[in-house]
From Swiss-Prot:
Top-rank taxon, per record: Eukaryota
UniProt GO cellular component terms: beta-galactosidase complex
Protein name in the entry: Beta-galactosidase
Enzyme Commission (EC) number: 3.2.1.23
Transmembrane region(s): none
Catalytic activity: Hydrolysis of terminal non-reducing beta-D-galactose residues in beta-D-galactosides
Coiled coil: none
GO-annotated molecular function: beta-galactosidase activity; carbohydrate binding
Designated gene of the protein: LAC4
Length: 1025
């Protein structure tokens, strides 16, 4: 019986055919000719339906549609070649390892290129593919060239014997699924096609440089003098010698901008005219040589000094046959005294996980978009990137080197989907990291402990190392992600150590770090971290390996909370060496959505389910510090503050400054007193040094003295503020000159004076109308009352939201027991008291509540007392406070408190105390609608009304929370365009609010930030001017 699945697609031992050995990547304009651009394209349901590429001619192919390379076929106009699929923890196909589905979309690409007789005579020709998803066959001029698997790894093919003078036809047959699909189950969209660059390489025939390995080692314990090792692989014998020239370094403060970075990556590299070291080796001598370098400047992420070099292959006539220009950084990575060290010093990761993503191009990310990402990271104090979960485009690593990042380079390997059936069947509930052991042990045999897949695992390990080995920014190799743990990982570790003993190896799936040099966790609680530290530290505080968090602070929607507590723990214990936030950006794909708010088409960002996938993982793909356009969210603003490399503490008439850099001093910074605008004289501080300076200032910022890298002079690195005392504005309560008109009617109570008219609905216990100077300040609009609900965040969904819904907190009702009105005393006009019980449907629990409105001529004091009674109470509440509907005369608001952005109890470190105006502040809108816009620690709030002055609000003795918005239906909205607008605004005035945490994938809200079930007593002054 013949099999309908081609053998290449179901044999994990066959990872390629005729692919050339992987070599270190370099780019040379003289060698590379881009084949990017329009290609002829046709999509077929299965390999069986696709044409025989050997018999395909250009006349037939050019009548097909065209597609741009690089791109994904699922992202073409009108989704005409199928739609994206999003999964995280599950496979989108039946598990039939190693077989892919028989119905397997197959894209056939074709184009031509021209070669003249000189090119045929002088050069060897290759085709290079930087990334094709999932696997492909290559044909040139009707002849089969080769085959390759490994979607995020490059491949080169020798096509010399297939090309001819004139027009040459290239055909690439791309298959959506194969046996390698099962080991490429990363948390992202399933997208297919030629999505990275395609190049025609022309290498000199008589001799060319095939590969280069450049390694640096310090030869003394003080890391002063170094040995530079250069190993050159030359193919061909028609050359005389090799020249190697090392040039004076460009120090780490070299100034770049986006255009200069892109220009260099396109081959337009400028060199120092001053040679540092020059060296030659004859053809018959070893092509591996070592050079002693006296006191080179070090490369670090904080000062990324690079030495450019030029490697020339010289012919017998003295001509240059080939020249390679690249750079080297002098740095040495070790595990010393249990810590990751670079150049002998411990480092701390302030990192992020970065996927390839573009909102319109998917993983076909233009280089300028990557540059934009990395510049943004530098602006936000990020010093490390984990390439999750596959190698990047090779040009990206030059950017890492130049800009200064610690990089974990990860193999293209994840098998998450093999765990999901067991997880669902057993409803596994266990504490991390025990879950890891249970899930991985049971499921490793499918792939990671399966000898049939060993070749594939090793191929991905070797490609990772051999292509990227020359980049100083890469200090750690990673064996993949969430792929259980088995014999194949052990083999990968052994191979990587053979290929490159100069770097460390990471793999989170290896709980006990048997095949890794570092312990690594994902989303642990603080208790688990501390337990692990104590279990791996002896009585003298020594340990063999550190712990990093390769994923933490899950940045899904409104969050992450408690980043400060993680960072404090990293600083406190040397055992921890920082971590990497999950993740850099949302993966939303731009599409047009029919809004449920107005029925019209609007731009939105798709997540799982928006393309009607049979299987998907929903909104879990929206979990970044940036939104889908890669613009900062409030979470990134918070992270910048928490990880700032200089700490500024202001208290008791002094300023204490601490340098938290790992290598550099504070000499590159200016410290400015924002109260006076003057510069503070701060001595040079080495890492971990502090100084305390007498000063009465309340606000200090640290900014760059000069342009450095991609950052401009004046760019803010860090800031500090004094803890300000509660500032209640001076307000004179007017004493009533004459008695107010009080009307205690059957349904309504009204109190009216010369400038104020207050009406309360006795039946509902809510303000019916509040007018000042005849203008409506607050009015009944579905009620103004004590409320507890807020729209859920993504981080509420796993537990808190379910609890709140279970206890019907969204269905709290106020049952009025009585309303009384009394004439005022001590200058007040009247006192209106509402006695009620606020409780949900179904449950016994509730609040015995007393609301007392003390009405003056120009203010209302609202005192609220709530006693929690009844059985079966919820553990906590989303919030507690009032909602007031603002009248049509509302204009804007200003506040004194934290700002200008949103803040929550566990996400507020980045928001500075100040006076802010809503006209100058734009509220952040999340790609996936949810609770947003809260302001904590507010001292007072002024709401301005046309023709009615302003309403000033403050709470005695402690700050409060507030939000002003015109949104509703946020709970039901699927995309930002679905959020409905009232056309008028409401004020949410809160006594307290629950934290946000990061429980979408991580720990719950910390105990101190939970709004626990309890009695509540609070009061607000509502003053009118």
């Amino acid at each position: 019986m013949s099999c309908l699945i081609p053998e290449n697609l179901r044999n994990p031992k066959k990872v390629h055919e005729n692919r050339l050995p992987t070599r270190a990547y370099y780019y040379d304009q003289d060698i590379f000719e881009s084949l990017n651009g329009p290609w002829a394209f046709a999509l077929f349901d299965a390999p069986l339906d696709a044409p025989d590429a050997k018999n395909l001619d250009w006349e037939t192919a050019k009548k097909w549609s065209t597609i741009s390379v690089p791109s994904h076929w699922e992202l073409q106009e009108d989704w005409k070649y199928g739609k994206p699929i999003y999964t995280n923890v599950q496979y989108p196909i039946p598990i039939d390892i190693p077989n892919p589905p028989t119905v397997n979309p197959t894209g056939v690409y074709a184009r031509t290129f021209e070669l003249d007789s000189k090119s045929i005579e002088s050069f060897e020709h290759r085709l290079r593919f930087e990334g094709v998803d999932n696997c492909y066959e290559l044909y040139v001029n009707g002849q089969y060239v080769g085959f390759n698997k490994g979607s995020r790894n490059g491949a080169e093919f020798d096509i010399q014997k297939y090309v001819s003078e004139g027009e040459n036809l290239v055909v690439v047959k791309v298959f959506k699924w194969s046996d390698s699909t099962y080991i490429e189950d990363q948390d992202q969209w399933w997208l297919s096609g030629i999505y990275r660059d395609v190049s025609l390489l022309k290498l000199p025939k008589k001799a060319h440089i095939e590969d280069v390995r450049v390694t640096t080692t310090f030869v003394d314990s003080q890391y002063q003098d170094a040995e530079l090792s250069v190993k050159v692989d030359v193919q061909g014998s028609s050359y005389d010698h090799i020249n190697f020239t090392l040039y004076e370094p460009e120090d780490g403060s070299k100034v770049y901008d986006a255009s200069s970075l892109l220009n260099e990556e396109n081959g337009n590299t400028t060199f120092s005219t001053k040679e540092f070291i020059s060296f030659s080796t004859k053809k018959n001598e070893e092509t591996a040589f070592k050079i002693n370098v006296k006191a080179p400047e070090h490369w670090t992420a904080e000062n990324p000094t690079l030495y450019k070099y030029q490697l020339d292959l010289i012919g017998s006539d003295g001509s240059v046959i080939q020249s390679i220009k690249h750079h080297v950084g002098f740095r040495q990575v070790e595990l010393k005294d249990g810590n990751i060290t670079v150049n002998g010093k411990d480092i701390l990761f302030r990192g992020v996980n970065r996927h390839d993503h573009h909102p319109r191009f998917g993983r076909a990310v233009p280089l300028d978009f990557v540059v934009r990402d990395l510049i943004l990271m530098k602006k936000f104090n990020i010093n490390a990137v984990r390439n999750s979960h596959y190698p990047n485009h090779p040009k990206v690593y030059d950017l890492f080197d130049k800009l200064g990042f610690w990089v974990i380079d990860e193999a293209d390997l994840e098998t998450h989907g093999v765990q999901e059936p067991f997880n669902r069947h057993t409803n596994l509930e266990a504490e991390y990291p025990d879950t890891k052991n249970k899930l991985y042990d049971v499921n490793a045999h499918y792939l990671s402990d399966n000898p049939e897949y060993e070749v594939a695992y090793l191929d991905r390990a070797s490609q990772l190392v051999l292509r990227d080995v020359n980049h100083p920014s890469i200090i750690i190799w990673s064996l993949g992600n969430e792929a259980c743990y088995g014999r194949n990982h052990k083999a990968m570790y052994k191979l990587i150590k053979q290929l490159d003993p100069t770097r460390l190896v990471h793999y989170e799936g290896d709980l006990n770090a048997l095949s890794a040099d570092i312990f690594s966790f994902m989303y642990p609680t603080f208790e688990i971290m501390e337990r692990w530290r104590k279990n791996h530290t002896d009585e003298n505080g020594k340990f063999e390996k550190p712990l990093i968090l390769c994923e933490y602070g899950h940045a899904m929607g409104n969050g992450p909370g408690s980043l400060k507590e993680y960072q404090e723990l990293f600083y406190k214990e040397k055992f921890y060496q920082g971590g990497f936030i999950w993740e850099w950006a949302n993966h939303g794909i731009e599409f047009e959505d029919v809004s449920t708010a107005d029925g019209k088409l609007h731009k939105a960002y798709a997540y799982g389910g928006d393309f009607k996938e049979e299987v998907h993982d929903g909104v879990f793909i929206m979990d970044g510090l940036c939104n889908s356009e890669h613009n900062p969210t409030p979470g990134l603003v918070e992270y910048k503050k928490v990880i700032e490399p200089v700490h500024i503490k202001i208290a008791h008439g002094s300023v204490t400054i601490t340098n938290k850099h790992d290598f550099i001093t504070t000499d590159h910074l200016l410290f400015i007193d924002k109260d006076t605008g003057k510069t503070i004289d701060v001595p040079s501080l080495k890492p971990e040094e502090s100084v305390t300076i007498p000063s009465d200032t309340t606000y200090v910022v640290a900014v760059l003295k000069d342009d450095a890298g991609v950052l401009k002079a004046g760019h803010e690195i860090a800031w500090g503020q004094a803890e300000l005392p509660l500032k209640v504005p001076d307000f004179v309560t007017e004493t009533a000159e004459k008695a107010a008109k009080i009307n205690d009617g059957k349904r309504y109570v009204s109190v009216e004076s010369s400038g104020l008219h207050f009406i309360l609905d006795k039946l509902l216990g809510k303000i019916e109308s509040l007018k000042v100077k005849g203008k409506e300040i607050s009015s009944k609009f579905e009620g103004s009352s004590i409320t507890f609900w807020r729209p859920p965040t993504n981080n509420d969904e796993p537990r808190d939201f379910k609890n709140w819904k279970k206890y019907n907190i969204d269905l709290m009702k106020q049952n009025i027991h009585g309303v009384s009105v009394e004439k005022g005393s001590n200058g007040s006009l009247a006192v209106v008291t509402v006695n009620s019980r606020i409780s949900p449907v179904v449950f016994y629990y509730g609040f015995e509540t007393v609301q007392k409105y003390t009405i003056f001529a120009n203010k209302i004091n609202l005192n609220t007392s709530m006693k929690l009674t009844g059985e079966y109470q919820p553990p906590d509440f989303p919030r507690v406070g009032y909602e007031f509907w603002l009248g049509d005369s509302y204009e804007s608001f200003e506040w004194l408190g934290r700002g200008p952005g949103e803040s929550y109890p566990d996400k507020k470190e980045s928001q500075r105390f100040g006076l802010y105006d809503s006209k100058d502040v734009e509220e952040f809108v999340y790609d996936y609608p949810q609770e947003n816009g809260n302001h904590t620690d507010t001292h007072f709030l002024n709401i301005k009304f046309e023709g009615a002055g302003k309403l000033s609000i403050f709470q005695k003795e402690k700050p409060f929370n507030f939000k002003i918005s015109d949104e509703y239906g946020v709970d039901e909205a699927a995309h930002a365009c679905d959020v409905k607008r009232y056309g008028r605004h409401y004020l949410r005035l809160d006594h307290a609010i629950h934290g946000v945490g990061s429980e979408a994938c991580g720990p719950a809200v910390l105990d101190q930030y939970r709004l626990k079930a309890q009695d509540f007593n609070f009061e607000f002054d509502l003053a009118f001017e």
